[in-house]
């Protein structure tokens, strides 16, 4: 019986943790955007009862969604209309149960040999909730947003998956815990897999429909995109799905490229072995390190939103098919050549560090060359001819 109860407990714990973090993320994002745009952001709610810095906004938002009127279009396909928001958030919650956020076994809830492959399969299903909601709303703006989201997901799922192949080649495993342990014995994959890291970050922004890739819900073009006809808690589920997807991608980025819950390398830093000797205290230390890295990636997410304007749809497709996919393939090619050229030696040997350095330099060179080509091949701005009269 416990085989049925234990997964359910994990899912409920993941749901509670994710929703608390998502609520805090929303407040942090609004405050940081306020600072970046030379304004205050939410800083008043809760001050009457002694809650500082506007932190009461974290509680005010869910209360607002609970109390708002729930309007359902009369022409909507009811079953699909209600399924859309739920299917949008469910994959992120399941994936969160698979990500190790601390040293095993306590802080790695489910260790799967093909965990990374399973995560890629699950994250790609979140688009079905968007497509269902857009189609079932029986609204032209919603349908257009859903179609945009489908095209965007197809375009960026390819570089999203290809960017991870380099990590699999050097670590030799699909198990996320083993990938973290490889990094603590070598060096963070951020350095030897610089191109894959760059491609992965761009692709995960696009998969989450975040600015500058937010064309499925472009307010200036499609009112609110696929969730135009949603209100109250159904709209909140779509918002939670977006932020939960952001959180999952930041966790995945931390595991794949930033060494997970470890610091530095085995000879000097905090490793899985050293944390395991401290028991639950070591687990909490590892989880705190992991959360700090995730929050750092989240800050970059927000920085991107505040910095870059929205792409046109043709620019979005060009970036995915003409630049990100070739970049990811080049990373796989270079990684394979270096792994074949250099012999397998012990950790810390001259050949080991030579391979890491060559991969890092090659990655930086590829990114620099790509940025140079982008500036040389940029399309001229479209100009409207002057009125003859």
Describe each region flagged by the PLM:
Residues 1-389:
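Selective transmembrane helix interface/packing segments
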